[in-house]
C-alpha cells in the first residue's frame, strides 16, 4: 500500500510539474510568477499585477485548456488500454481494437462532408463519438456467441470491421473539397491545438464518472486473469462484468477520440511499461496508468509545441514517434522469448 501511494504521489507531482512547465514554456515564454498569478487571479480571490497583459490569454485561454484536455484524454486512453489488455490477456492491444478509432473517423468525415462542422465546435465530437459507439457495439455483437464473448474473435472482428469502416471513410474522403480534407486530416492526426475550456468540460464529466468505475473493477480483472473457470468458481459473473467493462471502455475512448482526434500508442505503451515497474495487480495498475497516461500525453503535447516552434506538430505524430519504436521492440522481445500473446499476462 505504501509503495502504491508513494508511486502514485510521484506521478501526481510529476504531472503538476509538467503542467506548470507547459504553461510558461513555448513560443512565448511567460515567467512562472506570472503564470501562478494569472491562475490565482482567475479564482476571483486575488488581484495580482501581471507584468504583461498579453500573457493572460496565452496562459489561460490558449495553453491551459489544451493542457487540461491532454490530462483527461491521456489518462482515459491509458486507463482504457490497461483495462483492455487485462481483459483480453494481451499486452499489445488497446481500446482501439474494438473499432472506436475507425468509427470515430467515419463520424468525423461524415460531419465534415455534410458541412456541419461550421455550425458548432461540438458537431464533429458528437458525430465521431456516436459512430465510435455504434461500431464498437457491432464488433461486440459479432464476437459474442451464446452469451459468451471470445477474446480472439473480438480482436479479429475488430480488425475486420475497422478495415471495412476505414475503406468507407476513404471513399468519402475522395469526395471532399481541399479545405474539408485539411480539416479532417488535422483532426485524424490527433491534435490538441485550438482546444478550449468547452472541450475540457465536455470530456471532464464522463471521465470523472466512468474512470472510478474501472478502478473499482481492478479486483475482478485480477480474477479474470486466472481464467474463466477460476473466475466462475469465485462467483464472478463473467458475461455481466465483461459487458460493463467493454461499454465503459467504449464510452471513455469515444469521448477521448472525439475531442482530440486519433492519438495512438498512449493506451498501449503506458500500461506495458508500468507493468514492468509495479507489477500486474490491476487494483494499483489502473490508477497508476491514468496518472502516467496524463503525464505522457501532456509532455507529448509540450513537445509538439516546442520542437519546431513557432510551428506546431500534431501531438499524435509525437506519440507515434515515441510509441512505434517501443512497440516494435516489444514485438521482437515477445518473438524471441517464444511467448503466446494470449498467455503472457
Regions found by a protein language model. Give the residues of each.
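Alpha-helical transmembrane segments in inner-membrane proteins
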Residues: 1-345
Amino acid at each position: 500500500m505504501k509503495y502504491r501511494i508513494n508511486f502514485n504521489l510521484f506521478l501526481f507531482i510529476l504531472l503538476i510539474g509538467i503542467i506548470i512547465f507547459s504553461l510558461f514554456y513555448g513560443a512565448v515564454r511567460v515567467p512562472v510568477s506570472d503564470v501562478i498569478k494569472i491562475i490565482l487571479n482567475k479564482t476571483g480571490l486575488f488581484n495580482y499585477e501581471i507584468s504583461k497583459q498579453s500573457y493572460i490569454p496565452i496562459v489561460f485561454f490558449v495553453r491551459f485548456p489544451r493542457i487540461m484536455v491532454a490530462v483527461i484524454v491521456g489518462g482515459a486512453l491509458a486507463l482504457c488500454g490497461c483495462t483492455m489488455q487485462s481483459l483480453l490477456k494481451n499486452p499489445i492491444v488497446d481500446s482501439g481494437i474494438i473499432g472506436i478509432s475507425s468509427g470515430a473517423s467515419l463520424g468525423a468525415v461524415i460531419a465534415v462532408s455534410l458541412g456541419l462542422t461550421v455550425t458548432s465546435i461540438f458537431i464533429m465530437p458528437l458525430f465521431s463519438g456516436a459512430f465510435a459507439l455504434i461500431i464498437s457495439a457491432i464488433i461486440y455483437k459479432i464476437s459474442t456467441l451464446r452469451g459468451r464473448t471470445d477474446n480472439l474473435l473480438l480482436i479479429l472482428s475488430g480488425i475486420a470491421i475497422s478495415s471495412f469502416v476505414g475503406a468507407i471513410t476513404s471513399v468519402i474522403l475522395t469526395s471532399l473539397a481541399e479545405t474539408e480534407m485539411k480539416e479532417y486530416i488535422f483532426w485524424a492526426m490527433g491534435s490538441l491545438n485550438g482546444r478550449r475550456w468547452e472541450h475540457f468540460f465536455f470530456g471532464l464529466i464522463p471521465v470523472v464518472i466512468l474512470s472510478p468505475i474501472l478502478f473499482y473493477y481492478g479486483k475482478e480483472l485480477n480474477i479474470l486473469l486466472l481464467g474463466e473457470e477460476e473466475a466462475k468458481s469465485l462467483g464472478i459473473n463473467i458475461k455481466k462484468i465483461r459487458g460493463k467493462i467493454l461499454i465503459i471502455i467504449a464510452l471513455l475512448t469515444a469521448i477521448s477520440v472525439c475531442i482530440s482526434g486519433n492519438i495512438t500508442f498512449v493506451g498501449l505503451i503506458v500500461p506495458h511499461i508500468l507493468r514492468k515497474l509495479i507489477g500486474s495487480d490491476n487494483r494499483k495498475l489502473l490508477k497508476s496508468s491514468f496518472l502516467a497516461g496524463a503525464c505522457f500525453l501532456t509532455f507529448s503535447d509540450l513537445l509538439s509545441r516546442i520542437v519546431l516552434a513557432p510551428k506546431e506538430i500534431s501531438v499524435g505524430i509525437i506519440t507515434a514517434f515515441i510509441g512505434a519504436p517501443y512497440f516494435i521492440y516489444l514485438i521482437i522481445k515477445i518473438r524471441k522469448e517464444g511467448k503466446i500473446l494470449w498467455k503472457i499476462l
